[in-house]
Amino acid sequence: MDTFQLLLAVGVCFWIYFLWSRRRLYMMHFKIPGPMGLPILGIAFEYLITYKRKMSIRTKYMDIYGSTCLVWVGPTPFVITRDPKIAEEIFLSPECLNRSSIFSKPVNSCTGDGLLSLEASKWVDRRKNLNPAFKQNVLLSFLPIFNSEAKTLVAFLDSLVGQGEKKVRDDIVRWSFRIATQTTVGTDVKKDASFKNDSVLKSYETFMKIIVMNVLLPFTHNKIFSTLGGFETQKALAKSNVNKMIGTIVDKKLMTKPESGSQPEITSVINKAIELHRNGEMSREEVQSECCSFVVAAFETTGDTVYHALILLAMFPEHQDTVYQELKELFPVAGDFEVTYDDLQRMVFLERVVNETLRLIPSVPFTPRETIRDFRLSSGVVIPKGVGIGIDIFATHRNRDHWGTDPSSFNPDHFLPDNVRDRHPYAYIPFSKGRRNCIGWKYGLMSSKLALSKILRNCKVSTSFRYEDLEFVDNIGMELAQSPGLEFHRRT
C-alpha cells in the first residue's frame, strides 16, 4: 500500500508539474476561443473518423468561434485563421518564419534539407542564394521545355477525342512532373531510364503519400510504427531511386569544370546549386536535397492547377468560350504553335481563370508555421514560442467579408483590376506571401497558362460532373474526393 501511495503521489506531482509547465498554453485558450475536443485526442478524432470530409472541420470551427480560433490536435494547441489581417501579421513576422515541425519533419525525412523544410536560421541564406535560379531570364529559358511538353500533352488529350469522359488527372500530373524535373536538373534527365519508364515518378508519388500520412497522422512518423508498417522500406527504395537519378546528374556536372574567368550559367536550380557547392556554400548532399525538394514542391501543385482549371471550365462553358475566343485571336490556326512570353502576357482572361481556380481550389489549402519566439498579435494576444499557427488558405479564399455573399461561386471577374485593388492584399494567397512565400510562384503561373492555352485552343472540354458536387479533402496538396472525368472535343 505504501508503495502504491508513493507512486500515486509521484504521479500526482508529475501531473501538476505537467499542467503548470503548460499554463501559458491553457491561458492562451482563454483569449483565443475554440473547441477543447476530447481528452488527449483534442479534435484529432474527427480527422480519423471523417477522412473524406476533413476540409469542413476547420471551417466548421471558424464559423462557430470566429475567423481566428484555437484547436487542440492531441495535446498540441494550434492557432488557425482565415482573417487576411491576421494572415498578414503572421506572414510578415520574423517570429513565424519556421514551418511547423508537423510538416517539416516528414518532408525532411523524404527529401532532405531543402527550402521546403529548412528552419528559418538556415532558410534565409539558402533562399537568398537560390533566388537567381528563378529570375525572369531563367524562367524565359524554360519556355522551350514548357512548349515541348505541352505539345506532347495536347497530342495525348487529342487521342482521347470521341472516347467519352476520361480520368486525366494522373496524365496531367505526369506532364507536370516532366517539366518540373527538366527545369530543376536539366534536359539530360530525359536520357535516364528511370525517368523514361516513370519509376522515378512513382518514387516521388511514394514520397507524397508518406509525407501526407505523417502530417495527418503524426504517430505514423514514429520509426517503430513506420518500420512495422513497411513504410521505411518504401521510403528507402524511393530515396535510392531518386538519389541515383539526381546523383548521376550532379556528378556529371561536377566533373565539367567551368572555364577560367567565365561566369557560371544559371539556367536551372541544379546549376545554381552546383555554383554554390563550388563556392563552399552548399554541401553535395544539400545540392541533391534541394533538387529533390523543388520537384516535390512543383509537380503535383502545377499539374493540379491545370486539371482544376479544366474541370471548372468544363462546368462553366460560357467562361470556356471566352477563353477560346481570346486564344483564337492570338493563335488563328489550331495545332502546334510556339507560345512566347509576350503571348502569355496577352492572355488576360485566361490569367483571371487561373487565379479564380487557385482561389477556389488552392494547390496548397493550409500553411502551417511555428513560432520561433513569443509572437504578439495586433489584438494584444501573445502566442507562446513553439506553438503551431497556420493560415487556412482554402477558408481565407472563401471569406464572405472579402469575397462577397457568394464566395464559393466561380467568377473570374473577381480578378478584374478594380476588384483586386479594393480587396485586402492578403485575401488571396495561393502561393503564400510575405517573408517566406513560394519561390516558384511565377514558374507555376507561366507553365500553367502555357499548357492551358495549348489545350484550350485545340480542345473543347466538357463533363457531366456538377460543380456543386465537388468535395474537397484536406491534405498537404488539395485533393478532390472524386476526380471528375473530362471529355475532349477537337477544335479547328
Curated annotation (Swiss-Prot):
One of its GO terms (cellular component) is endoplasmic reticulum membrane. It is an enzyme of class 1 (oxidoreductase). Signal peptide: none annotated. It holds the Pfam family p450. Keywords: Endoplasmic reticulum, Heme, Iron, Membrane, Metal-binding, Microsome, Monooxygenase, Oxidoreductase. PANTHER family: CYTOCHROME P450 4C3-RELATED (PTHR24291:SF189), CYTOCHROME P450 FAMILY 4 (PTHR24291). This is Probable cytochrome P450 313a3. It comes from Drosophila melanogaster (Fruit fly). The lineage of its organism: Eukaryota, Metazoa, Ecdysozoa, Arthropoda, Hexapoda.
